[in-house]
Amino acid sequence: MAEERNFRKVRRGYVVSDKMDKTISVELEQRSTHPLYGKVVRSTRTVKVHDEHNEAHIGDLVSIMETRPLSKTKRWRLDSIIERAK
C-alpha cells in the first residue's frame, strides 16, 4: 500500500510576485550553451507556485517541487525558503 512516489522535479528560483493568496510567482532561469557559437544563453520562465502559509516574499530564493495540478496554471508547490531577501 505505501508505495514510493515517483521522482519529482525540484527547481530553485527567485520570487517575483507574492500578491496572490496562497500563490507566488517564481522565475526559473535556464542556462544552455549555443550549439554553434558556444555562448552561454540565459532563458527565463515564470511559474505559479502554491504557498500554503504565505511564507515567501518578493526577492526570496526558494526551492519548489512539482506536484499534481492544483488549478488551471499551478503545478508546483513551495518546498523550502533557501535565502530571505535582504
Curated annotation (Swiss-Prot):
GO cellular component terms, semicolon-separated: cytosolic small ribosomal subunit
Q: Which domain of life is it from?
A: Bacteria
Biological process (GO) annotations held by this record are: translation
Which GO MF term does the entry hold, naming one?
structural constituent of ribosome
The family database entries (InterPro entries) matched by this protein are listed as: NA-bd_OB-fold, Ribosomal_uS17, Ribosomal_uS17_bact/chlr, Ribosomal_uS17_CS
Record PROSITE patterns = RIBOSOMAL_S17 (PS00056)
Presence of the UniProt keyword RNA-binding in the record: yes
Query: By its UniProt entry, which Pfam families does this protein fall under?
Result: Ribosomal_S17 (PF00366)
**Coiled coil regions, renumbered to chain:** none
List UniProt keywords, sorted A-Z. Answer: Ribonucleoprotein, Ribosomal protein, RNA-binding, rRNA-binding
Assembly with partners or alone: Part of the 30S ribosomal subunit.
**Family, per the entry?**
Belongs to the universal ribosomal protein uS17 family.
User: Its function?
Assistant: One of the primary rRNA binding proteins, it binds specifically to the 5'-end of 16S ribosomal RNA.
NCBIfam families given for it? PRK05610.1 (NF004123), uS17_bact (TIGR03635)
What protein name is recorded for this chain? Small ribosomal subunit protein uS17
Species this protein is from: Bifidobacterium adolescentis (strain ATCC 15703 / DSM 20083 / NCTC 11814 / E194a)
What lineage is this protein's organism placed in? Bacteria, Bacillati, Actinomycetota, Actinomycetes, Bifidobacteriales
